[in-house]
UniProtKB/Swiss-Prot annotation:
Record keyword Nucleus present: yes
Annotation: DNA-binding region: 50-75
Its biological purpose: Transcriptional repressor that plays a role in the regulation of organ identity and spikelet meristem determinacy. Interacts with the TPR corepressors to possibly repress the expression of downstream target genes.
Description of the deletion phenotype: Delayed transition from the spikelet to the floral meristem, inducing the formation of extra lemma-like and palea-like organs.
Tissue expression summary: Expressed in roots, leaves, leaf sheaths, culms, panicles, lemmas, paleas, lodicules, stamens, and pistils.
Protein name in the entry: Myb family transcription factor MOF1
The keyword Transcription is annotated on this UniProt entry: yes
Domain HTH myb-type: 19-79
GO CC annotation terms, alphabetical: nucleus
Length: 306
């Protein structure tokens, strides 16, 4: 053991604890209230000293060592329960504020073991993490709601555009159909085309024939042809009352005078081309070419019922 009555020995051993014969002081509620009042009177736990607290308390049998140890425990409890103690104090106050019962004094926890303080700090940290996670979840949910609203608005706008385009197409189709019907109703002169191999004969409709066409028909009987300006003049004239029907026929065939010559040499001549003004033949064979007078082209026009 070390000499001198204190500290550690040369070997580093701890001095043996000697239990005092004086009984330990038990801090009752009254002593603790007196202790707290003395601290508050001195201006707080940082300004209060054990000597001044002991003088203000004035309790018989209370020593300065008792005040020192109790002040140290009080400071530790205040520092440890500063965050969680305030919440635990506010909850009973709120309950008392909203309840109809009598007010109850909130006990102050000044003796707090280290393990309990650690557990309380861990619970507070876990609750704080849960709160931050809930806030982040709320933000994520709000963002998701904004995205859903934006997608719904875009889909609605796209449907409106599609409906507008469909209405435009329907209106254009209806306008085209109405325009075709109006064009068919407003047509003043019409011609019916009849095909007969190998020629096409254009026959004017009967109810559109006018006086000018009658005059041209009489000229056709004398000259044997009809001018292209007849149809234009007929279109320019107003529509007269319906007249008698006319018939127009065109016949094409070989000249009867050339039939013996063609029948006599069918193999020597390959083709015969002729017209009303001039005639020539392009033939291939052993005996040469055969010149024919022409093809008989006659145009006749007569009034039906005459």
């Amino acid at each position: 053991m070390g000499s001198g009555g204190g500290g550690c020995g040369r070997n580093g051993a701890v001095r043996q604890y000697i239990r005092s014969k004086v009984p330990r002081l038990r801090w009752t509620g009254e002593l603790h209230c007196s202790f707290v009042q003395a601290i508050e009177f001195l201006g707080g736990q940082d300004k209060a000293t054990p000597k001044l607290i002991l003088q203000l308390m004035g309790v018989k049998g209370l020593t300065i060592s008792h005040v020192k140890s109790h002040l140290q425990m009080y400071r530790c409890s205040r520092l440890g329960s500063h965050g969680t103690g305030r919440r635990s104090e506010m909850q009973p106050q709120l309950q008392r504020k909203h309840s109809c019962g009598a007010d109850e004094q909130v006990p102050r926890e000044f003796l707090c073991p280290p393990l309990k303080r650690t557990r309380m700090g861990t619970e507070a940290t876990y609750k704080g993490m849960q709160g931050s996670q809930g806030i982040s979840e709320m933000r994520t949910t709000g963002t998701q709601y904004c995205i859903d609203d934006y997608m719904q608005a875009m889909a609605m706008e796209r449907r409106i555009k599609e409906e507008g385009l469909r209405w435009q197409r329907d209106a254009a189709a209806a306008a085209a159909a109405d325009g075709g019907a109006a064009a068919s109703n407003l047509q003043t002169v019409g011609c019916s085309v009849q095909e007969s191999d190998p020629f096409k004969i254009i026959k004017p409709e009967v109810h559109h024939l006018g006086p000018v066409l009658k005059l041209q028909c009489s000229k056709v009987e004398n000259s044997g042809f009809i001018s292209s300006s007849t149809g234009t003049a007929a279109r320019d004239q107003p529509e007269p009352p319906p007249l008698e029907k006319c018939s127009l026929s065109l016949s094409l065939g070989p000249d009867p005078k050339c039939m013996p010559a063609i029948a006599s040499s069918p193999s020597e001549s390959s083709c015969i081309l002729s017209s009303s003004s001039r005639s020539f033949s392009d033939c291939s064979g052993n005996s040469g070419c055969l010149v024919a007078p022409g093809v008989n082209l006659e145009l006749s026009m007569s009034i039906c019922g005459s």
